[in-house]
Regions:
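Surface-exposed charge patches in extracellular/virion surface proteins
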Residues: 10, 45-46, 64
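Short acidic DE-rich linear segments
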Residues: 2-6, 60-65
């Protein structure tokens, strides 16, 4: 399993980038913070602490929601 702090930081970084670019989004953490859901325009993407998350790639994908 990936480092939990790193996972949380990555989820929060993606969410922060969306907000900085004026994209209304939400974030929810579940399962003892081993899952996060980022919502943009009513669509959610689920991430788990086992995922290899690239912040720039995920931001670009969510930006298109």
């Amino acid at each position: 399993m990936a480092d939990k702090t790193s996972f949380l930081d990555k989820c929060l970084s993606i969410h922060s980038l969306l907000l900085q670019h004026g994209i209304d989004s939400g974030i929810i953490f579940k399962q003892n913070e081993s899952e996060c859901f980022i919502t943009v325009n009513g669509k959610s993407k689920r991430y788990t602490s086992d995922d290899d998350i690239d912040i720039d790639t995920e931001f670009s994908a969510l930006e298109k929601f």
